[in-house]
Structure formats: C-alpha cells, structure tokens
Curated annotation (Swiss-Prot):
Binding site for Mg(2+): 105, 227
Segments of this protein annotated with the region Linker: 230-250
Gene3D superfamilies: Hexapeptide repeat proteins, Spore Coat Polysaccharide Biosynthesis Protein SpsA, Chain A
Binding site for acetyl-CoA: 380, 386-387, 405, 423
Name of protein: Bifunctional protein GlmU
Catalytic activity as recorded in UniProt: alpha-D-glucosamine 1-phosphate + acetyl-CoA = N-acetyl-alpha-D-glucosamine 1-phosphate + CoA + H(+); N-acetyl-alpha-D-glucosamine 1-phosphate + UTP + H(+) = UDP-N-acetyl-alpha-D-glucosamine + diphosphate
Active-site residues annotated for this sequence: 363 (proton acceptor)
Reported cofactor(s): Mg(2+)
Annotated keywords: Acyltransferase, Cell shape, Cell wall biogenesis/degradation, Cytoplasm, Magnesium, Metal-binding, Multifunctional enzyme, Nucleotidyltransferase, Peptidoglycan synthesis, Repeat, Transferase
Coiled coil: none
Description of how the protein assembles with itself and partners: Homotrimer.
Amino acid sequence: MNNHTLNIIILAAGKGTRMQFDHPKLLHLLGGKPILEHVINLAQSLCPKTITVIYNKQYKKFKIKNKNNSITWIKQKKILGTGNAISQIINNYKDHENILILYGDVPLISKNSIQKMLLKKKNSTITLLTAKLNNPEEYGRIIRKNKKIVKIIEYKDATDEQLNIKEVNSGILIVSSTNLKKWIFQIHAKNNQNEYYITDIISLANKDNHKINSVRPEKNDEIQGINNLLQLVRAEKIYQKQQAKLLLLSGIMIYNPSNFSLRGTLKHGKNIKIDHGVILEGSVKIGNSVIIEPGCIIKNSTIGNNCTIKAYSIIEKTIISNKCIVGPFTHLQHGTVLKNNTHVGNFVEIKKTTLGSYSKAKHLSYLGNSQIGQKVNIGAGTVTCNYNGKKKLDTIIGDNVFIGSSTQLIAPINIKKGTIIAAGTTVMKNIHEPSLVYNEKKQIHKKL
C-alpha cells in the first residue's frame, strides 16, 4: 500500500476515570514518556499522508508543548464514543484513501504489526488487528460465522456465551475512507454505554457484503490497553522487558532484566555491565567497558569509556569522561563535569562543578559552583560554602592543590595551584601564591 494515501486517526479523548488519579490518563509515563507520545511516534514512523489526534480538554497543554505541523489536533466536542469522534472529521478525507485508526491508550503496538495490516488491506475493505487471549478480560469479542467476521461485540454488551470467545478486538483497524464516510453516520448509540462505537461499522460492512480481514500482532502483549493503574504497571513491565531484551541482544550485560528500567533513550558502546536495580532516565550515553553497580539512577548524562559507577549513586545532567570511578553513594547533580581519571567516592555531592583530571574527592564532601584543576586532593568533609543567603558564589581551585579533611572554603574564593590546606581549616580569602594554609588553634587539655 502507498502510504501517501494513508491517513491516521489517533483517538485520545477518553476521560480516563478508571485511573482514579488527578492526572490525564494518556500523560502518565510509560518508559519515561507519555503514553500518547508512544502512539504518536508510531504514527510518524509510518510516514502517512496525515495524522490527526482527537483529544479532550485535558490534553491542551500537551498539544501546545508538542505542536507539530505534521499533526492536526481536533478537540472532541462531546465525549459520545469513538464513532462520534470520527464522525467529526471524516468528511475532511478524500474518497478512495485509507484510514488507520489507532488508540492513544494502546501504546505497545509495533510498526511490524501495522505493516502486516497494510499488506492485508489490499485484499479487503476493512482489516482488523485481533488476538486470541486465554484471559480476554474486558476486550470486545470478535463474532465469526463460518470463519467470517460478522460483528464486534463490546465487553459490556456481550452475553455470557459471547464472553467465552477468546478472539478479541484490539481496536486498531484500517478502512477505506469512501466506505467509512457512509457507515459512520449509520451507527447508533443503542448499547449499555449510550455511545457511538466505531466497531459497529463491522456489522454494517458485513451487511453490504464487504470483505473483512484480520491480522494477528507480532506478540499479544502489543494490544495491552491502559485504562487503570494496574494495566499501566503491566504495560510498563512489558515495555521494560522488551527494552532489556534489545539491549542484551546488542551486547549489554544486564544481570537482572526484570529489575532494570530504561525510561528514555540509551546510546551505548560495547562491554557494558549493568547490575540489579539500575534506572536510566532521559537521554543517556554510555561508552565502552563501563560497569554500573546495583541501585544506580542515571538521568540525562554521559559516561565515557572504562568507568565504574559504584552502587547506589545518583547521576543527573552530568558529563563523566574516561577512566573515572564514581561512588558508592555519590550524588552528581546538574552541571557536573568529571574529567579523565577522576575519583569521586562515598557520600560526595557535586553540583555545577568541573573536577579536573586525576583529581579526587573520595569521602563525605560537598562541592558546588566550583572549577577544580588537575591532581587536586579533596579531603574528607570538605565543603564549598557557596551560598551567602542571596546568590551562589564560585570557588576556583588550581592544579596540584591538597585540601585536608574537614575544610571549609568560603566562596567567592580562588586558591592558587600547589597550595596545601591543613585539616580543619576555614579558608576565607584568596590564596595568590602556593602556600601552606591553616588556622591557628590550641589543643586544650583539662584534667578530669
């Protein structure tokens, strides 16, 4: 089929009341992005003539945020069912074209399954995506007579006998625009929901002796709909299983795929090992020969080659260069850059700071708004005091500086390269030349 005659309608106007949540259903996240976005991405990958999203007022902000000249957004005036939604726009389409109907709450459909439908559509007026399920739950049932599809009955309108049918309707179908224009205005709302069902066109097509084909999805999991939080969790599990499988097949060792979560995109090299309970969010890049230990959370960050991220570290909007060691229990916040061969250890927090090559902060420190040179030692308990109550202030530390334990650096401050700062020192002024810096303190002994 020529996709230049393919028009896609995405139905996204349902109220989502079964979610029991004060958040639009299709804006809940699946794999780190809104449910609806998955369906839009699928539609765009098919390169159709047009894409139209029929939405309700809950999605106005999402529409504005995702404004795209290739997508038309139509607000459903009254929420009276899928048939009513399509009747609002059907006359916008030319005759003798094809219309693919997707659902905003069925986000796991693969491109391969849709392409199978497109091929089958050449020999029919309507092609449905159906599946046989051992536990059909609340799906509409496919009614056949002598193997021929004659009707779709929705779950709430089905008899007990019909509910025993295992073949179900995914909702996804391809139909000719010419016939849809005719049938869409013949359907009625005489059902338990008092809604106009798009599925009623099947019985109308059968009466007019039109051929109705069906196609099975690549996997039954693809047709998982999302109407409540339980189904969302189920869909997330399916999605993460798919992502873990793809990564394993591409050479990433994931030790516990059932406890790995990719909530965005990952670009990666070779020889990567990811342990139990790791979460990757947003856009993440990982180089070659990287080890990520249990419980790490990595968001919108880049990790270079030959790095080890030790257990329970949190890394966000950070660039880590090559041969670095991070963690365990390290928090790297936005604006952090670790140059080659750096080592950041236990209970160290870094924010808006560049740590130069071969520098190390191995224990219990806070470094904020800092530029730190090469081969600098940050002793345990070092704190950059970078906030004066009104604004953040900068700390600059030159190369080869040694900072002893339990040191406070009062920003703004500039410390010359080669300086040695003794343990327990509070540094309040710039150090303009290599120096030994300490605060005089008396050690007092009193007899008990």
